[in-house]
Amino acid sequence: MNVLDHLKQKTLDEVKSYCKNTCIDAGVAMMHVSGDFNLSTLVRNANFFGFKEAMYVGGSKQWDRRGTVGTHHYTDLNHIKTEEMFVGYLKDNGYTLIAVENNIPKYSDKTVSIFNQWVFTGIDKPMFVFGEEKSGLSDYILDNAETIVTIPEYGSVRSLNVGTTSGIVMAFYRNYYEY
């Protein structure tokens, strides 16, 4: 069982209860239209940083859970079939849609660097949504986002791996939330 030492003797329900009691009111989601190996990393990161829930949008309910090292048992994970249903879910549940994307000049008016000290100011109950490795986020999601967070690149590569990006964003938000 890959849990903190003080949780090793706890039951599955006790560990899940611990996670619910220590999580913050924030969520993460990943587009999953054609399948993506990064979903398990997103779920593991959500658990590690104490996010309330993780979601995947599109595709099928089938995905490779091995990369979660069991965290999918303790962090709520929901599958939503369409982007429209996802946006509706967020509105019905009081989430603020925050897209995480890069290289999209069309949306420069609502794009902000994660290094901007005010990046999360005024955002309550965020749901950070990440695109698939090859296709990114659709215009529908970007149009419905309150803001778009980007991680500036300083080298030659165009983008980061989505799993890595999710960990960076969650770490930055958890730090903002705590301090």
Identify the meaning behind each predicted range:
Residues 1-179:
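Post-transcriptional modification and biogenesis factors for structured RNAs
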